């Protein structure tokens, strides 16, 4: 169910933003893994393909560094009400890091066990806006700083996974993974800092609200996988990840539907209520893929995958821990397909070049469809394999001002431009 949404970061507490557990190798191959025997990440993508390449034990550590940039701009009109340009009034750039890893153990012939710790849902989103006033001509400083608007969301839901694979026939493998989901240090902060009252601010006085959101209990999410290898050249994989319900307590920022855009939005109550609760039902995800070993003089592999999620089954309900009544948000999300493809070409025996791309539909509509490009390589040194991968993409959409000025009624929607890149390094050691 984790999709390569990869953007729309403002909606990070409504949609899972992490594209799932991937090593640098599978990330550089277009976030593949359904039909490719790649190691520990098969615990997540397709447990039927768990393998240690005939080694007894493989241990993998994965580090990532993600850069995110968001620019918001409002349209500038001429006397004929035509848009002359879009004036960028806030630009946020942040770097985030993460660590994941696990191991694959060969129990006996054609039977493998995988253990991993990975990020299931990353809630991180940071927004900082400097608000300036507008004074008449002749004033030395015509645009003094009047205040700041801030949003900070942090924390994640971590997946502790255990998976197994077994060969049932000579060409068919089956696998199962139990993903135990646990929330870790989730925070939600919303602030308006007023240095001096001004109509350009969203409030005439400062206020800050912070809540430490908790995931109610632990949730188990199963993944089922099957693979079929008709010959040495082709391998076909299928995976199914079951839908789950997640309940969050101590919620202050309440999701809602933005009336103008019909996109997700947020309501920030003026009074703190520690009994707020949000329950999100995430739909199941189905994936199918094929890996082909090309008949080239140099070793070459190609992968192609389709992923399907029926986001119309997504549900979000709000309520209180003090009573059983709940209110359901009807977001009217749409089903979405993803296409993942990649090529691994060895120029030298141990040094590959990898390239891939991802096309993702969005449950939010055509405006949010986007393409991501991936690149990578690797080097083998003895029993250790060092992999490097990078993924990058961008997105543009229209939305309201999230901190509207008190004096102005915003008529035109703003343009939000997002760009992101993620660099991953993997080290795998075989015993």
Set out the residue ranges of the language-model regions.
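Sec-dependent N-terminal signal peptides
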Residues: 1-3
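N-terminal, post-signal peptide beta-strand-biased segments of exported outer-membrane/organellar beta-barrel
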Residues: 5-121
């Amino acid at each position: 169910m984790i999709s390569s949404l990869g953007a729309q970061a403002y909606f990070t507490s409504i949609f899972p933003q992490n594209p799932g557990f991937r090593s640098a190798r599978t990330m550089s191959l277009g976030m593949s893994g359904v039909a490719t025997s790649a190691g520990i990440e098969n615990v997540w993508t397709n447990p039927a393909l768990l393998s240690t390449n005939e080694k007894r034990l493989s241990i993998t550590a994965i580090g990532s560094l993600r850069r995110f940039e968001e620019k918001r701009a409002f349209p500038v009109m001429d006397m004929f009400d035509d848009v002359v340009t879009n004036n960028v009034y806030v630009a946020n750039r942040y770097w985030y890091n993460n660590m994941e890893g696990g191991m694959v153990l060969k129990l006996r012939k054609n039977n493998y066990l995988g253990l991993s710790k990975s990020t299931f849902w990353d809630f991180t989103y940071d927004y900082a806006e400097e608000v300036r006033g507008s004074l008449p001509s002749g004033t030395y400083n015509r645009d003094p700083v009047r205040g700041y608007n801030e949003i900070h969301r942090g924390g994640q839901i971590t997946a502790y996974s255990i998976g197994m694979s077994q060969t049932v026939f000579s060409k068919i493998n089956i696998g199962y993974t139990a993903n135990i989901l646990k929330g870790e240090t989730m925070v939600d902060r919303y602030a308006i800092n007023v240095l001096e009252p001004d109509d350009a601010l969203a409030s005439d006085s400062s206020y800050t609200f912070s809540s430490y959101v908790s995931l109610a209990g632990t949730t188990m999410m199963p993944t089922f996988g099957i693979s079929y290898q008709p010959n040495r050249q082709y391998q076909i994989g299928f995976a199914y990840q079951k839908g789950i319900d997640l309940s969050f307590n101590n919620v202050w920022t309440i999701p809602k539907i933005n009336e103008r855009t019909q996109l997700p939005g947020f309501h920030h109550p003026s009074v703190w209520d520690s009994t707020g609760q949000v329950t999100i039902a995430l739909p199941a995800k189905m994936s199918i893929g094929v890996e082909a070993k090309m008949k080239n003089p140099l070793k070459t592999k190609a992968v192609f995958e389709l992923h399907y999620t029926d986001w119309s089954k997504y549900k979000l309900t709000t309520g209180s821990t003090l009573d059983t009544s709940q209110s359901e948000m009807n977001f009217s999300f749409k089903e979405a397909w993803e296409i993942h493809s990649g090529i691994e070409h060895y120029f030298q025996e141990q040094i590959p070049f990898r390239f891939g791309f991802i096309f993702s539909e969005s449950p939010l509509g055509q405006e949010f469809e986007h393409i991501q490009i991936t690149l990578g390589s690797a080097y083998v040194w003895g029993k250790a394999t060092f992999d490097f991968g990078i993924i990058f993409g961008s997105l543009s959409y229209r939305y309201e001002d999230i901190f509207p000025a008190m004096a102005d009624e915003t008529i035109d929607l703003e343009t939000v431009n997002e760009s992101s890149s993620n660099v991953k390094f993997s080290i795998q050691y075989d015993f």
